[in-house]
Regions:
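Juxtamembrane helix-entry segments on the extracytoplasmic side of multipass membrane proteins
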Residues: 1-6, 29-33, 37, 59-65, ...
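Specific transmembrane alpha-helical segments of multi-pass solute transporters/efflux pumps
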Residues: 15, 19-20, 48-98, 134, ...
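Transmembrane alpha-helices of multi-pass small-molecule transport proteins
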Residues: 27-77, 102-105, 159-164, 181-202, ...
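C-terminal transmembrane-helix exit sites in multi-pass transporters
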Residues: 46-58, 82, 101-126, 253-273
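Hydrophobic transmembrane alpha-helices of multi-pass small-molecule transport proteins
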Residues: 47, 68, 108, 117-139, ...
Length: 302
């Protein structure tokens, strides 16, 4: 992994960490399905503008089935699951659940492509899980009464991400990362559209705070979806599915930070300790060597 790849990984984690904050703010007003419909629609519109600017084509007739698969597993299903759980669970806990995606990814990599699980990768995954446990302090108080089944259900969301990631990896030579991101957003928009009449929530109740809710919706759609997913598919193409999925090890760091700053969630010593362990696990899984930074500097100054 190059320093540029690592920087992209951290920026992407900060953006996606904010998505749980935005969902917690907006989902009480809009409901899970309505919120995610807005999210994928705004993301699709932003990517459409980018495609027009850079003159990228979707080749929709040739690849519409591919986009439907990505739209279902990388957007519609996991997004709705997280939004549904955001009605009950905290943003911090949701960001930790998201961190199980690399574990699912390693299992699926072995089952899908027989990609060997090397000792370094296994150690990194173990450290990542340990770091997540430290971040949350294994505090049962994080779970409200009756929320265990919600937690069990939302664990399916990172599994969907892992499936989509490996599917995208198998098709990356045929389509540009932009096409994957753009096509999947429009597919998710279409997949969720028939569900809206049965979703229950009105688009915006009168009791909601319009500025706060719509600000969260815009942040979720434009920043956490349109921009973030374009960055993510580029990382999949550059690093491979298993390494790109390790961005989710970093997301709890930012998810807890944003939760503390904007939702008043407490941050203890385990946050700092967990962050260190998580970053170490990420380095092991991705194979990043900090010494490459010094090598590049020496070359550039020579």
């Amino acid at each position: 992994m190059t320093p540029a790849n690592l920087l992209q990984l951290i920026i992407l984690a900060a953006i996606w960490g904010a998505s749980f904050l935005f969902m917690r703010i907006a989902v009480p007003a809009l409901g899970p399905v309505w919120l995610i419909e807005w999210r994928v629609l705004l993301g699709a519109l932003l990517l459409a503008l980018a495609g027009r600017w850079f003159r990228h084509s979707l080749a929709l007739r040739a690849h519409w089935r591919h986009y439907l698969v990505l739209g279902l597993f990388n957007s519609a299903l996991p997004f709705v699951l997280f939004a549904w759980a955001a009605q009950t669970l905290t943003a911090s806990l949701l960001s930790v659940v998201n961190a199980t995606a690399p574990i699912w990814g390693a299992v699926i990599a072995w089952a899908w492509s027989r990609e060997p699980l090397k000792g370094r990768v296994a150690a990194g995954l173990a450290l990542g899980v340990a770091g997540v446990a430290l971040l949350m302090g294994l505090d049962p108080a994080m779970l409200k009464p009756g929320s265990g089944w919600v937690l069990a259900g939302v664990l399916l969301a990172p599994c969907c991400y892992a499936i989509a990631s490996h599917y995208a990896k198998s098709a990356r030579n045929a389509l540009l990362p932009y096409a994957n991101a753009h096509g999947s957003m429009w597919a998710a928009t279409l997949l969720l559209w028939p569900v809206l009449p049965f979703a229950g929530h009105a688009p915006l109740p009168e009791t909601a705070t319009p500025v706060l809710v719509w600000g969260a919706v815009l942040g979720l759609g434009l920043l956490c979806t349109g921009l973030a997913y374009l960055m993510y598919f580029r990382l999949v193409a550059a690093l491979g599915a298993a390494s790109a999925l390790t961005v989710t090890f970093l997301i709890p760091v930012f998810g807890i930070l944003w939760g503390h700053l904007f939702l008043g969630e407490a941050v203890g010593w385990q946050t700092l300790a967990g962050a260190l362990v998580v970053l170490t696990g990420t380095a092991l899984v991705t194979g990043f060597d900090p010494r490459t930074l010094w090598v590049r500097k020496a070359v550039s100054h020579g």
